[in-house]
Amino acid sequence: MARALVLLSVVLVSLLVNQGRASDNQRLFNNAVIRVQHLHQLAAKMINDFEDSLLPEERRQLSKIFPLSFCNSDYIEAPTGKDETQKSSMLKLLRISFRLIESWEYPSQTLSGTVSNSLTAGNPNQITEKLADLKMGINVLIKGSLDGQPNIDDNDSLPLPFEDFYLTMGENNLRESFRLLACFKKDMHKVETYLRVANCRRSLDSNCTL
């Protein structure tokens, strides 16, 4: 009888611990999604403010340029389209999100100076700090998904895309600034999508449609 009670206690403790971990993991996922949503909204606001400051002809010219241009993230292997994203594993989406955020650590230092924006006034390093916090959170989620297994991934050994990519391309400051803002918005949208699907992947019964 005593042994049965001890066994029951162990099982109950194990269940409580697992429930606690699941709750913490969900909280981390929710925080990560909220953080990248804010960055995506900030990116949209910054590029809108930038476009509003342009002359009509400048706006037309830049709108033709960007669809034909490349972003730094194009060198990072990632799902293309909704179907491939939905078929990707949670861990794969987390790893890609991590690399995308990491690739902006250096370029983000010039983002705040690209456009005068009330959202970044008083704290020019706000975007870089938010990216660092999000990167840390995603890294914790990756480690939690591995559950003690070594973090082995082919992309981990690859160098990040060129740090000065946005500074060396373009014919003038106007184009470089537009490219920087447009690519930042594009990549934050990617990460938001990947984290939403990854969060959905935690529940096998969920319909993770985009």
Swiss-Prot record:
Residues 1-22 form the signal peptide. Its main location: secreted. Zn(2+) binds at H38, E192. GO terms for biological process: animal organ development; growth hormone receptor signaling pathway; positive regulation of growth; positive regulation of receptor signaling pathway via JAK-STAT; response to nutrient levels. GO terms for cellular component: extracellular space. Growth hormone plays an important role in growth control and is involved in the regulation of several anabolic processes. Implicated as an osmoregulatory substance important for seawater adaptation. This is Somatotropin-2.
